[in-house]
Regions:
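Glycosyltransferase-associated regions of secretory-pathway enzymes
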Residues: 1-69, 85-245
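Small-residue hinge/turn detector
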Residues: 71-82
Length: 245
């Protein structure tokens, strides 16, 4: 393995010791079938010291494992380098040399937000470090007793914006630090309107399983997807515009 590119290691998180749903198994299977020369590493409570970080400890004790992974994914990439994938990310084709030669790579989730479902970086990347440092003195439990449900997508998008990146969904580069790809590369599924923007440039698809949400909420999402398949995603967009009016 060359030392001057992002290591061929896939990091993913699975905390809580529950059985993986079929969709998750299907996605992980796609990694193994397509990324045949990659090491795949699962981060869980047997591997990572839950008590090593206050935010992680509090989130774990609340059973909010998705928020545990918010920290652990960044910890893993910073300390070891490689590619982090959410468990509901399906890989479509092998990451190119162009992708792996970046200091770090990211993709847009929607036009105004950076995705955290697929992140790649060389070890000790400075942007990853800036992201990681935000969790060092952060509490998951607020002073009033509420939990902090600020998403890592919101957090990292603000960091990127401060660095001068335009949150407009276009390809952008910060030399020596990161490259940001359009939505079609790593997260082509439009979860708001339920249609796919997949193209020949697509490496991965984030299916937005949203395991941290209540079952009733996920069921509503499934119904919405079913309706979208029947009437078409573009028609969902039109309906939303009519409702907004």
């Amino acid at each position: 393995m060359r030392d001057d590119r992002i290591p061929k290691v896939i990091h993913y998180c699975w905390f809580g010791k529950k059985e993986k749903p079929d969709l998750i198994k299907k996605c992980i299977k796609s990694w193994k079938e397509i990324l045949i020369d990659y090491e795949i590493k699962e981060w869980n409570e047997d591997i990572f010291d839950i008590n090593s970080n206050k935010f992680v400890k509090e989130a774990y004790e609340e059973g909010k494992y998705a928020f545990v992974s918010d920290y652990v994914r960044v910890y893993a990439i910073y300390n070891y380098g490689g590619i982090y994938l959410d468990t509901d990310v399906e890989v479509c084709k092998e990451f190119s040399e162009e992708i792996l030669n970046n200091e770090s790579f990211w993709g847009f989730e929607e036009k105004n937000f950076i995705a955290t479902s697929t992140i790649g970086a060389k070890k000790r990347n400075k942007l990853i470090k800036r992201f990681l440092d935000l969790y060092e003195n952060k509490s998951f439990i607020k002073e009033n007793g509420d939990i902090d449900t600020t998403t890592n997508v919101y957090i990292v998008s603000n960091i990127i914006k401060e660095l001068g990146v335009m949150l407009d969904g276009t390809y952008q580069r910060i030399d020596g630090l990161a490259v940001f790809y359009p939505q079609e590369y790593f997260s082509p599924y439009d979860y708001i309107n339920c249609y796919s923007k997949k193209s020949e440039n697509t490496y991965a698809i984030h299916h937005f399983y949203k395991s941290w949400l209540p079952l009733t909420t996920r069921i509503k999402g499934t119904i919405k997807k079913t309706v979208a398949r029947i009437i078409g995603g573009n028609n969902v967009v039109k309906l939303r515009k009519l409702i907004i009016r």
